[in-house]
UniProtKB/Swiss-Prot annotation:
Annotated organism of origin: Candida albicans (strain SC5314 / ATCC MYA-2876) (Yeast)
Residues annotated as catalytic: 516
Summary of the function given for this chain in its UniProt record: Protein tyrosine phosphatase that acts as a repressor of the yeast-hyphal switch. Plays an important role in virulence. Negatively regulates CST20-HST7-CEK1-CPH1 filamentous growth pathway. Represses hyphal genes such as SAP4, SA5, SAP6, and HYR1, by acting through a CEK1-independent mechanism.
Region (Disordered): 55-88, 107-228
GO CC term (a single one): cytoplasm
Reported consequences of knocking out the gene: Derepresses filamentous growth and decreases virulence and resistance to cell wall and osmotic stress.
Any Pfam family hit: DSPc
Compositionally biased region (Polar residues): 107-126, 169-207, 216-228
Start-end of Low complexity biased regions: 55-81, 136-151
InterPro entries: Dual-sp_phosphatase_cat-dom, Prot-tyrosine_phosphatase-like, Tyr_Pase_AS, Tyr_Pase_dom, TYR_PHOSPHATASE_DUAL_dom
Identification of the protein by name: Dual specificity protein tyrosine phosphatase CCP1
Gene3D superfamilies (UniProt xref): Protein tyrosine phosphatase superfamily (3.90.190.10)
UniProt keyword Thylakoid present: no
Swiss-Prot/TrEMBL keywords: Hydrolase, Protein phosphatase
Length: 597
């Protein structure tokens, strides 16, 4: 027979204890709060474990009797003590059954002022099951805190106190697994997991409730069986975390000038409003005030697009997709109207020091005699001279690239204008082919005699036209050619005529001088174009040949530096030599074959 265990310490005596009804009443009245529940439950456990028979010897009944500090004054004999003990057990059984029924009815309704019975940990007589990591189970001890505070009492008949109860699949293992499952479900908490509902049958505060610490939880016990035979499962143990909860929208944005109270009044999310600084009205204004706002205030903040560049006059196409239209001073483009553009007139109004003149000499004025002799060599009539002068003047005026400044403070960039301080040929002209073709800078600055050469080609508009100083001019034998190029001129159309003239004099063994202002850009492009045509070279090969030279036939001209516009013109010239239908410039600039500006 198993001995029932009590939650309070008991004292075993060898003599027969004295007992009286007065002492029983005093015990129940003084210790009803602490040990009434424990004694009744232990007594009931004793009778359930021993069966329906209540007959026991005096030696068995003596250790299980409850010993108190009060001493009975009435002495009994051994025979009467046994009879009295049986009556005590009968009375105790009836009291315990009544106490259990009464506590089952009142277990779910705790009075507000009632304080649950708390037992010290040292009074536990049952060992805690292993593997729970100090987890306080409500089933391991009948009088635990969780069973008294948060759950209904469990029927003692369903609890197995066998030493091997951990091996049997009973209700204890089922409840333990269910609680472990509930712990695993609620361990991982995130921002979208709704908290578990609070227990309604507990009066203790839950402010210090920690989800991640299972040792500090008080998990309610599932009531597996009752008198009615119905099963109840706590919904909080099997609750799945809500991971599909839609996050709330961000709070509505507060307006820049609106009242602070209007922020929380609206729950609908709104997009940021239009900036009030541009419209000059506050967010609290009414709709009528906004509609009555003048359009002149909004027009002040309107972005004005920039003006079109000079090379895209009267053009509907994008300025970035059309190259500048450059004109040669040797001829006149008949398709262009001879008129001053509105941009040029606006330049004259804004700048007082800007004039539109032909840069044929150093004083930026037109030399009528030289321009007439260049275009009409065989005509000496004054009317023809005036017509030719007007034609050249109108051609230059129609190209806005030829705007020049008379101010002495203005200095053009080096890539657009050669500096006169460059002295690329301190030892005189450079031999660029078989001592017949020479490259040099302005001969007026170098003080050399141009009459020693059979052909002189001047391709710089900054240099003076020295045709009057060149003596004994004979066609195809002794000539002076003046072509006023700028750094942005379209030289590809003139290179065929110039290279043919050079090849003609070179074949006859005559000396040729090619020069510009510094001899490193425009005149160097003429020599490169001659190499391309004479030796059938590309632009890169011809350029490297002139720059590095040849030890026997060509001197190295390492100071040459044509700008990118002239390089593109050389590529255009190479395309024309190869009879290409689409030029390189058209491919690079993505422009159509003909452009009407």
């Amino acid at each position: 027979m198993t001995t029932p265990l009590s939650s309070y310490s008991t004292t075993v005596t060898n003599h027969h204890p004295t007992f009286s009804f007065e002492s029983l009443n005093s015990i129940s009245s003084n210790n009803s709060t602490r040990n009434n529940q424990s004694n009744s439950v232990n007594s009931l456990l004793y009778f359930n474990s021993s069966g329906s028979s209540m007959v026991s010897s005096s030696s068995d009944a003596a250790p299980t009797s409850i010993s108190t500090t009060t001493t009975s004054t009435t002495s009994m004999t051994g025979a009467s003590a046994n009879a009295d003990n049986q009556q005590v057990y009968t009375i105790t059984e009836e009291d315990s059954i009544n106490d259990i029924n009464r506590k089952e009815q009142n277990s779910f309704s705790i009075q507000p002022n009632q304080t649950p019975t708390m037992l010290p940990t040292s009074s536990y007589t049952l060992q805690r099951p292993p593997g729970l990591h100090e987890y306080t189970s409500s089933i391991s001890s009948i009088s635990s805190t969780s069973s008294n505070s948060t759950s209904a009492p469990v029927s003692p008949a369903l609890i197995n106190y066998s030493p091997k109860h951990s091996r049997k699949p009973n209700s204890l293992n089922l409840n333990r697994n269910m609680k472990n499952l509930s712990l695993n479900l609620h361990d991982s908490t995130n921002g979208y997991t709704s908290p578990l509902p609070k227990s309604t049958n507990s009066n203790q505060p839950r402010s210090n409730f920690i989800m991640d610490s299972p040792s500090k939880k008080s998990t309610p016990v599932n009531r597996i069986g009752n008198n009615n035979g119905n099963d109840y499962i706590n919904a909080t143990l099997l609750q799945t975390p809500s991971i599909t909860q839609t996050p709330t929208m961000p709070p509505p944005l507060s307006l820049a000038q609106g009242p602070p109270s209007s922020v929380g009044s609206e729950s609908v999310y709104k997009f940021p409003p239009i900036s009030n600084a541009c419209l000059n009205y506050s967010a609290g204004d009414s709709d009528s005030e906004v509609e009555s706002m003048s359009m002149k205030q909004a027009a002040k903040n309107t972005i004005i697009p920039p003006m079109a560049p000079p090379f895209a006059l009267q053009s509907k196409s994008s300025p970035l997709s059309t190259p500048p239209r450059l004109h040669s001073p040797l001829g006149v483009d008949r398709g262009l109207p001879i008129s001053m553009s509105p941009i040029q007139s606006s330049l004259n109004q804004k700048f007082n020091n800007i004039t539109l003149q032909t840069p044929l000499n150093s004083s930026f004025s037109i030399n009528n005699d030289e321009a007439t002799n260049f275009n009409n060599k065989n005509n000496k009539n004054n009317n023809n001279n005036s017509t030719a002068t007007t034609t050249i003047t109108n051609t230059i005026l129609s190209t806005p690239q030829n705007v020049r400044y008379n101010s002495k403070k203005f200095h053009p960039p080096e890539e657009l204008q050669e500096s006169t301080s460059i002295n690329a040929y301190p030892n005189g002209p450079k031999n660029v082919l078989n001592n017949l073709i020479y490259l040099y800078s302005d001969p007026a600055q170098g003080k050399i005699d141009i009459n020693k050469f059979d052909l002189v080609i001047n391709v710089a508009k900054e240099c003076d036209n020295m045709s009057l100083q060149y003596m004994n001019q004979v066609p195809n034998q002794r000539e002076y050619v003046y072509i006023p190029w700028s750094h942005n001129s379209n030289i590809s159309k003139d290179l065929f005529q110039i290279t043919n003239k050079i090849d003609q004099f070179f074949t006859n063994g005559r000396k040729i001088l090619i020069h510009c202002q510094c001899g490193v850009s425009r005149s160097a492009c003429v020599v490169v174009a001659f190499y391309m045509k004479k030796f059938q070279l590309g632009v890169n090969e011809a350029y490297e040949l002139l720059k590095n030279g040849d030890q026997k036939y060509i001197d190295a001209c390492d100071r040459i530096c044509p700008n990118m516009n002239l390089i593109f013109e050389l590529m255009e010239f190479g395309d024309k030599l190869n009879n290409n239908e689409i030029s390189t410039q058209q491919l690079l600039m993505n422009s159509p074959p003909t452009i009407n500006l």
